[in-house]
Amino acid sequence: MKIAFGMIVFNGDFVLQECLESVYPYATQILISEGPVRYWQDQGFTTSTDRTNEILDNFPDPDNKITIVHGQFEEKDGECRAYMPHMRDDIDYIWNLDSDEVYKPEDIEKLIKVLEEEKYTSVGVRSCSFYGGFDYYIGGFELARDNFLR
């Protein structure tokens, strides 16, 4: 199964490295749109001002999976559309994620197994929130219910 991960990011250096590390082994392709939406442009921003671009430029990509589109966007949906023309023709699924999402390998593997067994057109995943690091869980969906499909 070939999965493209699509990400939008602007000033997202907090867990961007961990996000990329968590999905890279499972990706056929990673498509990233980096840049501000209109609100941030109106505040004078033209690109990320934290370490986002440094992380993107230096992330190890030995398999040439990553495509980065830099730009300024009207809204987030336009930012997503900016990377779509770069998606390979042989991709089975696109997994949209935010730059602050980190996945455990067992969760990605479980979802891939489900997708291989059934041909779903849309799948949602549960989330949980952390504060100050991955040790401090502050909320999210009930983790005991291990149900990825909606």
Please place each PLM-identified region on the residue numbering.
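Cell-envelope/extracellular polymer assembly enzymes that use nucleotide-activated donors
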Residues: K2-A4
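Short hydrophobic beta-strand elements that form part
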Residues: G6-M7, L31
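Short, solvent-exposed loop/turn segments at secondary-structure junctions
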Residues: F10, V37-R38, F73-E75, D100-V102, ...
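Short, well-formed alpha-helical segments that are part of the catalytic scaffolds
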Residues: G12-W40
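Active-site-proximal specificity loops/subdomain of glycosyltransferases
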Residues: S33-D92
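Conserved catalytic core of nucleotide-sugar-dependent glycosyltransferases
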Residues: M84, K104-R150
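Short beta-strand-to-loop acidic/aromatic patch adjacent to the donor-nucleotide binding site
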Residues: D90-K104
